[in-house]
Design a protein with these regions (language model features):
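His/Glu-rich zincin catalytic helix
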Residues: 1-79, 187-297, 417-425
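Charge-rich, well-structured scaffold segments of protease-associated domains
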Residues: 79-231, 269, 275, 279, ...
Protein backbone atom coordinates (compact mmCIF):
# COMPACT_ATOMS: atom_id res chain seq x y z
CA UNK A 1 0.00 0.00 0.00
CA UNK A 2 1.49 3.31 -1.13
CA UNK A 3 1.02 6.48 0.95
CA UNK A 4 0.69 9.75 -0.96
CA UNK A 5 0.55 13.19 0.66
CA UNK A 6 -0.08 16.38 -1.28
CA UNK A 7 1.73 19.10 0.64
CA UNK A 8 -0.07 22.01 -1.01
CA UNK A 9 -3.53 20.77 -0.07
CA UNK A 10 -2.48 18.83 3.04
CA UNK A 11 -4.36 15.72 1.95
CA UNK A 12 -3.21 12.11 2.35
CA UNK A 13 -4.43 8.99 0.61
CA UNK A 14 -3.28 5.41 0.12
CA UNK A 15 -3.32 3.41 -3.11
CA UNK A 16 -2.97 -0.24 -4.00
CA UNK A 17 -3.74 -2.32 -7.07
CA UNK A 18 -4.89 -5.76 -5.97
CA UNK A 19 -3.88 -9.02 -7.65
CA UNK A 20 -7.14 -9.11 -9.59
CA UNK A 21 -6.49 -5.61 -10.95
CA UNK A 22 -8.90 -3.64 -8.75
CA UNK A 23 -7.49 -0.17 -8.06
CA UNK A 24 -8.17 0.88 -4.47
CA UNK A 25 -7.75 4.42 -3.13
CA UNK A 26 -8.29 5.17 0.56
CA UNK A 27 -8.50 8.86 1.39
CA UNK A 28 -7.65 9.35 5.04
CA UNK A 29 -9.76 11.87 6.95
CA UNK A 30 -8.73 11.57 10.62
CA UNK A 31 -11.30 12.78 13.13
CA UNK A 32 -14.31 12.18 10.89
CA UNK A 33 -17.00 9.69 11.91
CA UNK A 34 -18.52 9.51 8.43
CA UNK A 35 -17.24 7.15 5.76
CA UNK A 36 -18.05 6.96 2.06
CA UNK A 37 -17.07 4.24 -0.40
CA UNK A 38 -17.62 4.48 -4.15
CA UNK A 39 -17.04 1.70 -6.67
CA UNK A 40 -17.06 2.71 -10.33
CA UNK A 41 -16.53 1.43 -13.85
CA UNK A 42 -15.63 3.64 -16.84
CA UNK A 43 -18.77 2.39 -18.58
CA UNK A 44 -21.03 5.34 -19.34
CA UNK A 45 -23.77 6.34 -21.72
CA UNK A 46 -21.21 7.14 -24.44
CA UNK A 47 -19.93 3.55 -24.52
CA UNK A 48 -22.22 2.24 -27.24
CA UNK A 49 -19.39 0.90 -29.40
CA UNK A 50 -16.39 -0.79 -27.78
CA UNK A 51 -13.26 -2.44 -29.12
CA UNK A 52 -10.83 -4.97 -27.68
CA UNK A 53 -7.08 -5.40 -28.26
CA UNK A 54 -7.73 -7.82 -31.14
CA UNK A 55 -9.87 -5.27 -32.97
CA UNK A 56 -13.19 -7.00 -32.24
CA UNK A 57 -16.03 -4.51 -31.87
CA UNK A 58 -19.07 -4.74 -29.63
CA UNK A 59 -22.17 -2.57 -30.02
CA UNK A 60 -24.88 -1.95 -27.45
CA UNK A 61 -28.28 -0.25 -27.47
CA UNK A 62 -28.38 3.30 -26.13
CA UNK A 63 -28.91 3.41 -22.36
CA UNK A 64 -27.38 0.02 -21.57
CA UNK A 65 -25.06 1.39 -18.85
CA UNK A 66 -28.05 2.98 -17.09
CA UNK A 67 -30.08 -0.22 -17.55
CA UNK A 68 -27.27 -2.23 -15.89
CA UNK A 69 -27.16 0.23 -12.99
CA UNK A 70 -30.87 -0.42 -12.37
CA UNK A 71 -30.41 -4.19 -12.47
CA UNK A 72 -27.34 -4.37 -10.22
CA UNK A 73 -29.44 -3.79 -7.10
CA UNK A 74 -31.68 -6.74 -7.91
CA UNK A 75 -30.68 -10.08 -6.37
CA UNK A 76 -32.96 -13.09 -6.21
CA UNK A 77 -32.05 -13.93 -2.61
CA UNK A 78 -31.78 -10.46 -1.01
CA UNK A 79 -32.96 -6.86 -1.12
CA UNK A 80 -29.69 -4.92 -1.41
CA UNK A 81 -31.13 -1.54 -0.42
CA UNK A 82 -32.88 -2.94 2.65
CA UNK A 83 -29.67 -4.71 3.65
CA UNK A 84 -27.70 -1.45 3.55
CA UNK A 85 -30.44 0.28 5.56
CA UNK A 86 -30.41 -2.51 8.14
CA UNK A 87 -26.68 -1.84 8.63
CA UNK A 88 -27.23 1.91 9.02
CA UNK A 89 -25.83 2.86 5.60
CA UNK A 90 -27.31 4.91 2.77
CA UNK A 91 -26.69 3.46 -0.69
CA UNK A 92 -27.11 4.99 -4.13
CA UNK A 93 -25.81 4.87 -7.68
CA UNK A 94 -25.63 6.97 -10.82
CA UNK A 95 -24.77 6.70 -14.49
CA UNK A 96 -23.18 9.57 -16.41
CA UNK A 97 -21.94 9.73 -19.96
CA UNK A 98 -18.52 8.49 -18.81
CA UNK A 99 -18.97 6.21 -15.80
CA UNK A 100 -21.31 4.21 -13.60
CA UNK A 101 -20.79 4.43 -9.84
CA UNK A 102 -22.23 2.70 -6.77
CA UNK A 103 -21.66 4.14 -3.32
CA UNK A 104 -22.69 4.08 0.31
CA UNK A 105 -22.11 6.36 3.27
CA UNK A 106 -22.38 5.68 6.98
CA UNK A 107 -21.33 7.05 10.34
CA UNK A 108 -21.31 3.55 11.81
CA UNK A 109 -19.33 0.41 11.14
CA UNK A 110 -18.11 0.07 7.55
CA UNK A 111 -17.30 -3.65 7.62
CA UNK A 112 -20.71 -5.00 6.60
CA UNK A 113 -21.61 -2.27 4.08
CA UNK A 114 -18.18 -2.43 2.43
CA UNK A 115 -18.39 -6.18 1.89
CA UNK A 116 -21.93 -5.77 0.58
CA UNK A 117 -20.85 -3.04 -1.87
CA UNK A 118 -18.05 -5.23 -3.24
CA UNK A 119 -20.29 -8.30 -3.38
CA UNK A 120 -23.37 -6.85 -5.07
CA UNK A 121 -21.40 -4.90 -7.69
CA UNK A 122 -19.34 -7.97 -8.56
CA UNK A 123 -22.35 -10.20 -9.22
CA UNK A 124 -25.04 -9.71 -11.85
CA UNK A 125 -28.21 -11.66 -11.06
CA UNK A 126 -30.89 -11.14 -13.71
CA UNK A 127 -33.54 -13.11 -15.56
CA UNK A 128 -35.48 -12.55 -18.77
CA UNK A 129 -38.58 -11.73 -16.71
CA UNK A 130 -36.80 -9.18 -14.51
CA UNK A 131 -35.29 -7.47 -17.56
CA UNK A 132 -38.69 -7.18 -19.23
CA UNK A 133 -40.21 -5.77 -16.05
CA UNK A 134 -37.46 -3.14 -15.77
CA UNK A 135 -38.10 -1.85 -19.27
CA UNK A 136 -41.44 -0.36 -18.27
CA UNK A 137 -39.88 1.35 -15.25
CA UNK A 138 -37.07 2.91 -17.30
CA UNK A 139 -39.39 4.02 -20.12
CA UNK A 140 -41.64 5.74 -17.55
CA UNK A 141 -38.56 7.50 -16.16
CA UNK A 142 -37.54 8.65 -19.66
CA UNK A 143 -41.07 9.87 -20.42
CA UNK A 144 -41.01 11.91 -17.22
CA UNK A 145 -37.83 13.69 -18.38
CA UNK A 146 -39.46 14.29 -21.78
CA UNK A 147 -42.12 16.36 -20.00
CA UNK A 148 -39.50 18.58 -18.27
CA UNK A 149 -38.75 21.57 -20.50
CA UNK A 150 -35.19 22.13 -19.20
CA UNK A 151 -34.16 18.51 -19.84
CA UNK A 152 -35.92 18.47 -23.20
CA UNK A 153 -34.18 21.68 -24.30
CA UNK A 154 -30.75 20.19 -23.61
CA UNK A 155 -31.58 16.86 -25.25
CA UNK A 156 -33.00 18.46 -28.40
CA UNK A 157 -29.91 20.67 -28.57
CA UNK A 158 -27.57 17.67 -28.53
CA UNK A 159 -29.76 15.95 -31.13
CA UNK A 160 -29.47 19.05 -33.31
CA UNK A 161 -25.67 19.05 -33.02
CA UNK A 162 -24.63 15.41 -33.36
CA UNK A 163 -25.07 12.98 -36.27
CA UNK A 164 -23.40 9.88 -34.78
CA UNK A 165 -22.08 10.76 -31.34
CA UNK A 166 -23.87 9.05 -28.39
CA UNK A 167 -24.47 12.47 -26.80
CA UNK A 168 -27.51 12.63 -29.07
CA UNK A 169 -29.10 10.05 -26.77
CA UNK A 170 -30.35 10.52 -23.23
CA UNK A 171 -28.21 8.75 -20.62
CA UNK A 172 -31.09 6.30 -20.26
CA UNK A 173 -31.44 5.85 -24.04
CA UNK A 174 -34.86 6.12 -25.65
CA UNK A 175 -37.96 3.96 -25.65
CA UNK A 176 -36.87 1.94 -28.69
CA UNK A 177 -33.37 1.22 -27.35
CA UNK A 178 -34.69 0.26 -23.92
CA UNK A 179 -37.41 -2.00 -25.34
CA UNK A 180 -34.84 -3.75 -27.57
CA UNK A 181 -32.30 -4.46 -24.79
CA UNK A 182 -31.93 -8.16 -23.99
CA UNK A 183 -30.67 -10.09 -20.99
CA UNK A 184 -27.83 -11.45 -23.14
CA UNK A 185 -26.70 -7.92 -24.07
CA UNK A 186 -26.74 -6.84 -20.44
CA UNK A 187 -24.72 -9.87 -19.36
CA UNK A 188 -22.16 -9.42 -22.15
CA UNK A 189 -21.76 -5.71 -21.36
CA UNK A 190 -21.39 -6.52 -17.66
CA UNK A 191 -18.72 -9.18 -18.27
CA UNK A 192 -16.65 -6.81 -20.41
CA UNK A 193 -16.91 -3.73 -18.18
CA UNK A 194 -17.28 -4.86 -14.56
CA UNK A 195 -14.04 -6.84 -14.25
CA UNK A 196 -11.97 -5.74 -11.19
CA UNK A 197 -9.14 -4.77 -13.55
CA UNK A 198 -11.42 -2.20 -15.14
CA UNK A 199 -12.95 -0.81 -11.95
CA UNK A 200 -11.87 1.46 -9.11
CA UNK A 201 -12.86 1.63 -5.44
CA UNK A 202 -12.39 4.91 -3.57
CA UNK A 203 -12.99 5.16 0.17
CA UNK A 204 -13.01 8.37 2.19
CA UNK A 205 -12.89 7.69 5.91
CA UNK A 206 -11.32 8.54 9.24
CA UNK A 207 -10.87 4.85 10.01
CA UNK A 208 -7.52 3.02 9.85
CA UNK A 209 -6.55 2.65 6.15
CA UNK A 210 -4.53 -0.53 6.74
CA UNK A 211 -7.48 -2.28 8.38
CA UNK A 212 -9.79 -1.18 5.57
CA UNK A 213 -7.34 -2.32 2.90
CA UNK A 214 -6.94 -5.70 4.57
CA UNK A 215 -10.71 -6.18 4.57
CA UNK A 216 -10.84 -5.34 0.84
CA UNK A 217 -7.95 -7.74 0.09
CA UNK A 218 -9.69 -10.48 2.05
CA UNK A 219 -12.97 -9.94 0.22
CA UNK A 220 -11.32 -10.03 -3.18
CA UNK A 221 -9.13 -13.06 -2.44
CA UNK A 222 -12.29 -15.10 -1.85
CA UNK A 223 -13.51 -14.56 -5.44
CA UNK A 224 -12.52 -15.93 -8.82
CA UNK A 225 -12.59 -13.80 -11.97
CA UNK A 226 -11.97 -14.63 -15.61
CA UNK A 227 -8.81 -13.14 -17.17
CA UNK A 228 -9.19 -9.47 -18.04
CA UNK A 229 -9.81 -8.71 -21.71
CA UNK A 230 -9.00 -4.97 -21.98
CA UNK A 231 -11.67 -2.99 -23.79
CA UNK A 232 -12.04 0.65 -24.71
CA UNK A 233 -14.55 3.00 -26.28
CA UNK A 234 -14.29 2.98 -30.05
CA UNK A 235 -13.52 6.48 -31.38
CA UNK A 236 -16.49 8.23 -32.97
CA UNK A 237 -16.13 9.76 -36.42
CA UNK A 238 -18.40 12.77 -36.11
CA UNK A 239 -18.85 15.29 -38.92
CA UNK A 240 -18.06 18.93 -38.16
CA UNK A 241 -21.49 20.00 -39.47
CA UNK A 242 -24.61 20.07 -37.32
CA UNK A 243 -27.76 18.02 -37.91
CA UNK A 244 -30.21 20.93 -37.66
CA UNK A 245 -29.28 24.61 -37.75
CA UNK A 246 -32.69 25.54 -36.39
CA UNK A 247 -35.29 23.49 -34.56
CA UNK A 248 -38.49 24.56 -32.81
CA UNK A 249 -41.20 22.64 -30.99
CA UNK A 250 -43.97 23.35 -28.49
CA UNK A 251 -44.48 22.35 -24.87
CA UNK A 252 -46.79 23.26 -22.04
CA UNK A 253 -44.82 26.36 -20.93
CA UNK A 254 -45.69 30.05 -20.67
CA UNK A 255 -42.47 31.71 -21.90
CA UNK A 256 -40.24 30.47 -24.76
CA UNK A 257 -36.95 28.79 -23.87
CA UNK A 258 -34.05 28.59 -26.24
CA UNK A 259 -30.51 27.34 -26.54
CA UNK A 260 -27.78 28.55 -28.87
CA UNK A 261 -25.05 25.92 -29.18
CA UNK A 262 -21.85 25.65 -31.19
CA UNK A 263 -20.15 22.39 -32.06
CA UNK A 264 -16.48 22.67 -31.09
CA UNK A 265 -13.44 20.67 -32.13
CA UNK A 266 -12.58 17.87 -29.65
CA UNK A 267 -9.37 17.76 -27.62
CA UNK A 268 -7.67 14.41 -27.04
CA UNK A 269 -5.20 15.30 -24.27
CA UNK A 270 -7.04 15.21 -20.91
CA UNK A 271 -5.16 17.98 -19.08
CA UNK A 272 -5.11 20.27 -22.12
CA UNK A 273 -8.83 19.63 -22.50
CA UNK A 274 -9.38 20.67 -18.89
CA UNK A 275 -7.24 23.80 -19.36
CA UNK A 276 -9.16 24.83 -22.47
CA UNK A 277 -12.49 24.20 -20.74
CA UNK A 278 -11.48 26.45 -17.85
CA UNK A 279 -10.29 29.19 -20.22
CA UNK A 280 -13.61 29.16 -22.07
CA UNK A 281 -15.63 28.97 -18.86
CA UNK A 282 -13.79 31.98 -17.41
CA UNK A 283 -14.39 33.91 -20.64
CA UNK A 284 -18.10 33.04 -20.49
CA UNK A 285 -18.21 34.32 -16.92
CA UNK A 286 -16.43 37.56 -17.82
CA UNK A 287 -18.69 38.25 -20.81
CA UNK A 288 -22.00 36.56 -19.95
CA UNK A 289 -22.62 37.13 -16.25
CA UNK A 290 -23.12 40.02 -13.85
CA UNK A 291 -19.40 40.79 -14.29
CA UNK A 292 -20.37 42.31 -17.65
CA UNK A 293 -21.64 45.91 -17.12
CA UNK A 294 -24.36 45.25 -19.73
CA UNK A 295 -25.84 42.30 -17.85
CA UNK A 296 -28.40 44.29 -15.85
CA UNK A 297 -29.58 46.00 -19.03
CA UNK A 298 -30.14 42.59 -20.66
CA UNK A 299 -32.29 41.63 -17.68
CA UNK A 300 -34.19 44.92 -17.66
CA UNK A 301 -34.96 44.64 -21.38
CA UNK A 302 -36.13 41.04 -20.99
CA UNK A 303 -33.49 39.60 -23.34
CA UNK A 304 -32.50 37.20 -20.55
CA UNK A 305 -34.23 36.10 -17.35
CA UNK A 306 -33.38 34.35 -14.10
CA UNK A 307 -33.32 31.12 -16.13
CA UNK A 308 -30.09 31.84 -17.98
CA UNK A 309 -26.71 30.21 -18.26
CA UNK A 310 -23.71 29.17 -20.30
CA UNK A 311 -21.60 26.04 -20.36
CA UNK A 312 -18.77 24.33 -22.19
CA UNK A 313 -18.07 20.61 -22.56
CA UNK A 314 -14.93 19.33 -24.28
CA UNK A 315 -14.24 15.65 -24.77
CA UNK A 316 -11.76 13.51 -26.65
CA UNK A 317 -14.30 13.16 -29.47
CA UNK A 318 -16.74 16.06 -29.01
CA UNK A 319 -17.07 19.69 -28.01
CA UNK A 320 -20.05 21.94 -27.18
CA UNK A 321 -20.37 25.64 -26.34
CA UNK A 322 -23.81 26.45 -24.96
CA UNK A 323 -25.89 29.51 -24.04
CA UNK A 324 -29.53 29.33 -22.95
CA UNK A 325 -32.33 31.40 -21.43
CA UNK A 326 -36.08 31.89 -21.11
CA UNK A 327 -37.33 34.95 -22.99
CA UNK A 328 -39.99 36.36 -25.29
CA UNK A 329 -37.18 38.08 -27.24
CA UNK A 330 -35.64 35.03 -28.86
CA UNK A 331 -34.12 36.91 -31.82
CA UNK A 332 -32.55 39.46 -29.47
CA UNK A 333 -31.01 36.63 -27.42
CA UNK A 334 -29.51 35.06 -30.55
CA UNK A 335 -27.97 38.41 -31.46
CA UNK A 336 -26.71 38.79 -27.90
CA UNK A 337 -24.96 35.41 -28.04
CA UNK A 338 -23.30 36.47 -31.31
CA UNK A 339 -22.00 39.60 -29.59
CA UNK A 340 -20.81 37.65 -26.54
CA UNK A 341 -18.88 35.19 -28.71
CA UNK A 342 -17.19 38.11 -30.51
CA UNK A 343 -16.34 39.65 -27.13
CA UNK A 344 -14.80 36.37 -25.97
CA UNK A 345 -12.54 36.26 -29.04
CA UNK A 346 -11.38 39.86 -28.55
CA UNK A 347 -11.45 39.96 -24.79
CA UNK A 348 -9.56 42.62 -22.88
CA UNK A 349 -9.38 40.83 -19.57
CA UNK A 350 -9.92 42.86 -16.42
CA UNK A 351 -7.18 41.40 -14.23
CA UNK A 352 -9.03 42.14 -11.00
CA UNK A 353 -12.20 40.43 -12.26
CA UNK A 354 -10.17 37.45 -13.50
CA UNK A 355 -8.41 37.01 -10.17
CA UNK A 356 -11.74 37.25 -8.36
CA UNK A 357 -13.20 34.52 -10.60
CA UNK A 358 -10.15 32.30 -10.20
CA UNK A 359 -10.24 32.68 -6.43
CA UNK A 360 -13.94 31.78 -6.42
CA UNK A 361 -13.44 28.62 -8.49
CA UNK A 362 -10.21 27.64 -6.79
CA UNK A 363 -11.79 28.23 -3.37
CA UNK A 364 -14.72 26.04 -4.39
CA UNK A 365 -12.29 23.30 -5.48
CA UNK A 366 -10.44 23.49 -2.16
CA UNK A 367 -13.72 23.40 -0.21
CA UNK A 368 -14.71 20.29 -2.17
CA UNK A 369 -11.90 18.50 -0.31
CA UNK A 370 -14.24 18.62 2.68
CA UNK A 371 -16.96 16.80 0.73
CA UNK A 372 -16.53 13.02 0.75
CA UNK A 373 -18.77 12.67 -2.32
CA UNK A 374 -16.79 15.28 -4.28
CA UNK A 375 -13.47 13.64 -3.40
CA UNK A 376 -14.62 10.19 -4.49
CA UNK A 377 -16.20 11.15 -7.80
CA UNK A 378 -13.51 13.75 -8.55
CA UNK A 379 -10.70 11.25 -8.03
CA UNK A 380 -12.48 8.56 -10.05
CA UNK A 381 -13.15 10.88 -12.98
CA UNK A 382 -9.60 12.19 -13.10
CA UNK A 383 -8.17 8.66 -12.86
CA UNK A 384 -10.41 7.32 -15.61
CA UNK A 385 -9.52 10.34 -17.79
CA UNK A 386 -5.83 9.76 -17.14
CA UNK A 387 -4.69 12.79 -15.14
CA UNK A 388 -3.75 13.54 -11.54
CA UNK A 389 -6.61 14.75 -9.35
CA UNK A 390 -4.64 17.64 -7.84
CA UNK A 391 -3.16 18.65 -11.20
CA UNK A 392 -6.72 19.28 -12.30
CA UNK A 393 -7.17 21.69 -9.38
CA UNK A 394 -3.83 23.41 -10.06
CA UNK A 395 -4.89 24.26 -13.62
CA UNK A 396 -7.42 26.86 -12.42
CA UNK A 397 -4.75 28.68 -10.44
CA UNK A 398 -2.29 28.70 -13.35
CA UNK A 399 -4.53 30.24 -16.04
CA UNK A 400 -3.48 33.70 -17.24
CA UNK A 401 -5.35 36.34 -19.24
CA UNK A 402 -3.35 35.54 -22.39
CA UNK A 403 -4.32 31.85 -22.08
CA UNK A 404 -8.01 32.77 -22.16
CA UNK A 405 -7.58 34.99 -25.21
CA UNK A 406 -5.49 32.38 -27.06
CA UNK A 407 -8.07 29.63 -26.49
CA UNK A 408 -11.09 31.79 -27.35
CA UNK A 409 -9.47 33.07 -30.55
CA UNK A 410 -8.85 29.49 -31.66
CA UNK A 411 -12.52 28.49 -31.43
CA UNK A 412 -14.41 27.74 -34.64
CA UNK A 413 -18.00 28.80 -33.93
CA UNK A 414 -19.38 28.35 -37.45
CA UNK A 415 -21.23 25.10 -36.74
CA UNK A 416 -24.22 26.33 -34.75
CA UNK A 417 -27.70 25.15 -33.78
CA UNK A 418 -30.55 27.17 -32.32
CA UNK A 419 -33.30 25.27 -30.49
CA UNK A 420 -36.48 27.01 -29.34
CA UNK A 421 -39.34 25.69 -27.21
CA UNK A 422 -42.51 27.71 -27.78
CA UNK A 423 -45.63 27.69 -25.59
CA UNK A 424 -48.49 25.53 -26.82
CA UNK A 425 -51.40 27.57 -28.11
Amino acid sequence: MKRITNERYQETYYTETLENGLRVVLWYKPGYARSLFMMATPLGAMDLMQEDAQGNTYSYPAGIAHFLEHKMFEKQDQDVMNEFSRMGANVNAFTSYNETAYYFSTSGSIEGPLDLLLDFVQQLDISDASVEKEKGIIVSELNMYQQMSDSRLLMETYQSLFHEHPLKYDIGGDENSVRSTTRQQLEACYQRNYHPGTMMLVGVSGKDPEQIMEQIRRNQRSKQFAPLCPIHRRPIREAASVVRERHAFSMDITVPKLAVACKLAPCVDALERLRREWCIRLAQDLCFSSLNPQYQRWLDEGIISDFVGADVDLGADHGVLLFYTETQKTAAFEALVDDVCKQMAALTVDEEALQSLKHRYFGSAVRSLGSFDDIAIGYIRSAFAGYDYFAGMDIIDAIRAEDILEVCRSLDLTHRSVVVITPKR
